Regions:
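C-terminal hydrophobic helical "lid"/dimerization subdomain
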Residues: 4, 305-362
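NAD(P)H dinucleotide-binding glycine-rich loop of Rossmann-like/cofactor-binding domains
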Residues: 55, 67-71, 76, 97-162, ...
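Glycine-rich beta-strand-centered segment in the early N-terminal region that forms part
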Residues: 30-49, 61-105, 227
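Glycine-rich phosphate-binding loop and adjacent beta-alpha segment
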Residues: 231-324, 362
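Mid-domain Rossmann-like dinucleotide-binding core that forms the NAD(H)/NADP(H) cofactor-binding site
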Residues: 133-207, 211-212
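A short acidic, Gly/Pro-enriched loop at the edge of an enzyme's catalytic core
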Residues: 214-223
Length: 362
């Protein structure tokens, strides 16, 4: 397993051999006093790497502090096979291939989670695709259908459209019959975003983002999905149509890229920059929002895993689309488990496309 003893750089991603009878746990087992009979132990084949894992390593992820503290094993998603199960678990067999979510703990060769957080592996997924699917898919589903609730024909702007969550948002919007404009930060990402369903793609490295956005939907957007933070939040809000909704699920541009750090360590100068960005993050006035008939919504998926009603509803829809080939993971880049530092560094660079996963060396 990978354990982070304290906040810091890549050297804090400490690999530790896990004995055959040991496992990590999803944090909600103890938080919710979930019974032993309702738990499963999964031998993992792969686990997904998300930007939240990087923030956890830096000590900037609030739910990590609230639910676990230090030391912590990061990770929210995995694929593998059922190794053991409680007596109340009747919907899975020993050895059955599954994928699932956890509240931390997924960077491990063996993890114990509640049965409602594990699902049968779809036939059209391999274990790498499955390990990189759930966190981004659930994030996109919640933002799209629980918060934004667009109507067919709505105009939707998706920042970071080539990323894990962004590519899922594009596909969900397409399934729902919306007009999708995707934003990417580099030319090599344009073709991918077109392939997954964007009607228009804005390459902000080659053209003015907001002039292009206005040309595609002069009347504004019914929904804008923004995980950038201070760099784009105000303009995202300003480009909403009346009745529009800005959905925020991250603040990537507030944080340094790997090229700005030394071995993944945030320098004193970068901490000052983070503080400056925090201070200059737009503040949305409720009176102005009411006058302009616009909304701003934000969420953090790790606080939602205990909502079984949402998990069941979202997974039913997501798996329905997966089985019919309407929803795909896209590009998945695997890294050997012990190369977790490289995976973090590459993700921090902002140059990756799709999802990164760590694979076990059985």
């Amino acid at each position: 397993m990978i354990k982070i003893p304290s906040p810091g750089g890549y050297d804090k991603l400490v690999y530790t051999d896990l004995a055959e009878d040991r496992y990590t746990e999803s944090a909600n087992i103890k938080l919710e006093n979930i019974k032993e009979e309702d738990l499963v132990v999964v031998k993992t084949y792969a686990c997904g790497v998300n930007y939240a894992d990087v923030c956890t390593r830096w000590g900037l992820y609030e739910s990590a502090k609230k639910f676990v503290g230090w030391p912590i094993t990061p990770g929210f998603e995995f694929s593998g096979e059922i190794e053991s199960k409680g007596e109340n678990v009747t919907n899975f067999k020993i050895g059955q291939k599954v994928f699932g979510v956890s509240i931390f703990g997924a960077y491990s060769k063996r993890i114990r989670v509640p049965k409602h957080q594990v699902f049968p592996l779809p036939e059209n997924f391999d274990t790498h695709e499955a390990a990189g699917f759930l966190t981004v898919a659930l994030t996109a589903w919640y933002g799209m259908f629980e918060l934004a609730r667009p109507r067919a024909g709505s105009w939707i702007l998706v920042h970071s459209a080539a990323g894990g969550v962004g590519s899922m948002l594009v596909q969900l919007a397409k399934i729902h019959g919306c007009n999708v404009v995707g934003v990417v930060g580099a030319s090599h990402k344009v073709d991918l975003v077109k392939q997954i369903g964007c009607h228009h793609v804005i390459d902000k490295s080659m053209e003015d983002l907001w002039k292009a956005a206005e040309s595609h939907s002069p009347g504004g957007y019914q929904v804008v999905f923004d995980a950038n933070g201070v760099d784009t939040l105000q303009e995202s809000y300003d480009h909403l149509a009346p009745g529009g909704r800005l959905v925020v699920y991250g603040f990537h541009t507030m944080l340094p890229r790997s090229s700005d750090t030394s071995n993944g360590v945030i320098s004193w100068w970068q901490w000052i920059k983070i503080g400056w960005n925090y201070k200059n993050t737009p503040q949305f006035n409720p009176l102005k929002m009411t006058t302009e008939n616009k909304s701003v919504m934000a969420f953090n998926l790790s606080f939602l895993f205990n909502r079984r009603d949402i998990l069941e509803e979202s997974m039913a829809q997501l798996l329905y689309w997966v089985k019919r080939g309407l929803l795909k993971v896209g590009k998945v880049t695997p890294y050997p488990f012990k190369e977790v530092s490289k995976a973090h560094s590459d993700l921090e660079s902002g140059q990756t496309v799709g999802k990164l996963v760590l694979t076990m060396d059985y």
